[in-house]
A protein has these predicted regions:
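Membrane-interface transmembrane helices that cradle and orient dolichyl/undecaprenyl
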Residues: 223-224, 261-279, 311
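Short acidic/glycine- and proline-prone juxtamembrane loop motifs at membrane-interface regions
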Residues: 242-256
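Transmembrane-helix signature of polytopic, membrane-embedded enzymes
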Residues: 216-239, 491-500
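Start-transfer (signal-anchor) and selected internal transmembrane alpha helices
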Residues: 17-136, 320-328, 553-564
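Extracytoplasmic catalytic/substrate-binding loops of multi-pass membrane glycan-assembly enzymes
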Residues: 141-157, 161-196, 349-351, 392-396, ...
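Membrane-interface anchor segments at the N-terminal boundary of transmembrane helices
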Residues: 78-92, 199-200, 421-502
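Transmembrane-helix motifs of polytopic, lipid-linked glycan transferases
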Residues: 203-224, 262, 478-485
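Membrane-proximal stem/loop segments at transmembrane-domain junctions that anchor or position
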Residues: 341-445
Length: 590
């Protein structure tokens, strides 16, 4: 009980405890003379693999059913409207697509599709065209940063101009010291490109956008897809055009995702082919991603689990190198920027708002905001405590205890809360992107052309979201196929790396502050898995389906997508009146 309490109160203690146990198990598993250790090693690997795929399967079902039933819209006031979707049509579309793919092997000319260099050239051409469009949008829009993006920039700019107001006690950086990495990055950019230069950050985002599109295809290659499959995944990334609109967001979202995906690719390559340089650059890329945006720690945890799993499966002590480098890099990424900022500003940065305040916000069903989204709770309790983090933590822990007690007394209210909260952050097809551009446009001193204003308007976002909700449902449907439908070919261990990262992101944001811009990286990351789900479905023949259905577990796995469609239809029917009423109200306020 004491150990559990210490883990809750001290995250570093919990991390060290887990890592110590993992290292003990990991180092002892290479004792080739011990049969018992081999059994333990194999048992741990099997348990981990099955647990990840089972949990991911249920998360995929949750997301798929939610996307079929709900579409969340985000107007200017940033309060989500959870409305009905075209559930019947989406279910029919998914069913028809799956049936068509099962007939794929019976159509000979589809098997003779072109592969090789022309498709690779086409893929690179599409990436460059998408990047050129992003560069044009940055130059055309001329959008300036707001809120956190603005305040981190102002903090860096202040240091260059010789004042440290933003770092003093009670100011922005003392409250949010985890933004030190982003502020340091801004400081370096402003030092090199000039203090009035905002567009350099946005152009770097354009390059990061192209890296993300490239990385999607590279994951597809690693998972066994051929050139057509890789091109299809890249096209999916381009069709998800909200990703491109993130280039104007002067924040660590795009660059952190590009670095993280590059780090994942290098880690997978290291486990397959070795090479110390891959370990070094993987750790470097992931550490920089965490420095710029701490949320990418979940990616690092996923890579660490993958490295331990790969090392145990292959009895490869070489993975100790990237594990060590990642741990060192993680410590440096979370602590070094704070120390540098303290040195530059001459101020001491505290720990900021306690973790408990974010958990209270993430678990509060507040009528004034969306469920689990940002509220003024942290600011209010900070003022109430006299800017004392210890007292604020005590207040937040009491409130957290009351919230959890209420959910324990009424578990249905907690389930309802999670359904609505996750609908706002996982079933908003635009993932905050156009909302960010619209708000920045409305706050701009220079007005944009009328057509651009209409394109970014709340009313037009409604129609764009309806179109993208189809793509979103198909993506989540592909994840269901990947997780549940038996595969006619051996799955690669590296596929589970993406699965465990999405799983971690989903669970984390069930309890943490919700926002579409936070969940977008996980959504983009699993595009290759979604395509792989459809890709493997079309490899099935009548014989392979009968063979996979022989054990009872095989029948259950084939039934899961059908049960998901049935659950979506029943939910949509049960909630048709309130969802329809909400949709009509939203149309009126537009």
């Amino acid at each position: 009980m004491v150990i559990v309490q210490m883990c809750f109160q001290n995250r570093s203690f919990a991390k060290n405890l887990i890592l110590s146990f993992s290292c003990f198990l990991f180092t002892n598993s290479f004792n080739k003379g011990s049969v018992s250790m081999k059994r333990i090693r194999q048992g741990c690997c099997d348990f981990y693999r099955r647990l990840v795929r089972l949990l991911f399967g249920f998360v995929a079902l949750w997301l798929f059913v939610s996307s079929l039933v709900f579409t969340s819209y985000l107007p200017y006031n940033e309060i989500s409207w959870i409305c009905s979707d075209y559930t019947v049509l989406l279910c029919l579309l998914f069913a028809v697509l799956c049936l068509a793919l099962l007939q794929y092997r019976k159509i000979p000319f589809l098997q003779k599709g072109q592969q090789g260099r022309p498709l690779r050239i086409a893929r690179w051409g599409m990436i460059l065209c998408a990047g050129a469009l992003a560069i044009w949008w940055v130059g055309f829009a001329g959008l300036l940063p707001l809120t956190d993006a603005k305040w981190t920039r102002e903090s860096a700019l202040g240091l260059l101009q010789g004042y440290s107001y933003w770092f003093e006690n009670g100011s922005y950086m003392s409250i949010y010291p985890h933004q030190s990495g982003l502020a340091l990055y801004q400081y370096l950019l402003l030092s090199v490109f000039g203090q009035d230069n905002v567009i350099c950050f946005q152009y770097i985002n354009c390059f990061a956008y192209m890296v993300i599109l490239w990385a999607m295809g590279e994951f597809s290659y690693l998972f066994g897809m051929k050139d057509r499959g890789c091109l299809a995944v890249t096209i999916l990334g381009i069709l998800f055009y909200p990703l491109m609109f993130y280039v104007t967001f002067v924040y660590g979202t795009l660059l952190g995702l590009a670095l993280s995906m590059t780090g994942l690719l290098l880690a997978i390559r290291f486990c397959e082919k070795g090479g110390w340089h891959r370990a070094v650059f993987s750790a470097l890329a992931l550490s920089l991603a965490v420095m710029i945006k701490p949320n990418y720690e979940i990616f690092v945890v996923g890579v660490l689990l993958y490295l331990v799993y790969s090392g145990l499966m292959k009895q490869n002590k070489g993975v100790l190198l990237p594990i060590f480098l990642l741990l060192v890099g993680l410590m440096a990424a979370t602590r070094l920027p704070i120390k540098i900022m303290e040195q530059l500003s001459g101020c001491t940065l505290n720990n900021g708002y306690p973790t408990s305040t974010w958990l209270v916000m993430g678990l509060t069903d507040c009528e004034e905001t969306s469920p689990g989204w940002w509220s003024n709770y942290a600011n209010d309790t900070y003022a109430q405590s006299g800017k004392n983090a210890v007292i604020q933590n005590q207040i937040a822990l009491e409130d957290l205890k009351a919230i959890l007690s209420g959910y324990l007394r009424n578990p249905f209210s907690f389930v309802r809360f999670l359904v609505l909260k996750n609908a706002t952050q996982w079933c908003e097809p635009l993932f905050h992107a156009l909302w960010l551009n619209n708000v920045m446009m409305l706050c701009n001193e220079t007005p944009m052309p009328q057509w651009a204003q209409e394109f970014l308007s709340t009313s037009n976002q409604y129609y764009l979201a309806q179109g993208l909700s189809v793509l979103q449902s198909l993506i989540y449907g592909g994840l269901v196929l990947w997780a549940w439908v038996p595969s006619p070919e051996t799955r690669k261990d590296s596929e589970d790396l993406l699965a465990v990262i999405l799983l971690g992101g989903f669970l984390f944001h069930c309890f943490w502050e919700a926002k579409g811009q936070y969940t977008m990286p996980y959504y983009v990351l699993v595009f290759p898995l979604a395509k792989l789900g459809y890709e493997r479905l079309k490899l099935h023949s009548a014989d392979s389906i009968r063979e996979s259905c022989n054990p009872l577990s095989g029948k259950v796995r084939w039934l899961m997508p059908l049960l998901a469609l049935l659950a979506a239809l029943l939910m949509a029917y049960a909630m048709r009146e309130p969802l329809k009423e909400t949709l009509e109200m939203y149309k009126e306020i537009m």
